[in-house]
Amino acid sequence: LFSATLDRAQERRISEILVDPIRLQISSGDLTNNHVQQELIHLKDGQVKIEVLKEMLQRPGFDKVIIFAETKRWVSKINRKLRQADIRSDEIHGDKSQNYRQKALNSFKAGKLQVLIATDVAARGIDVDDVSHVINYQIPRSMDSYIHRVGRTGRAGKTGIAYTFIES
């Protein structure tokens, strides 16, 4: 079902009929930083997301990258795959101790890591200068999460790029 607007009665009816409906809300764009270029990556049939990600991270300019995933399990899986490909990465999420998260964040800030993988919970607490790219490995569940993720790049008047993977 596609509609430009839905009133509450329509939303109630939809929730009665559809199983696990997905709501896509498009905003005016005024909510995100104007210094951030936002791009979608449409995965074609047969493309493996982690392989596309690894290829992206080999490109020039992908120096300080934050990757966001929906769950702690996904964050750990992505980190494991990137490390197997000799990409300097680490992860932060709720199952890691505060000490571990701080060490990983400090290593990322110091340039010892190319990539930091995090859950949305971490998105609000990450304050790092010069993040070149943000990659949404999975589409965030809310507009608020998207805004906070994308807001990790393009700070202090600098430009940044945010990518979001889209699967068919």
What are these regions (language model features)?
Residues 1-168:
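Conserved helicase RecA-like core
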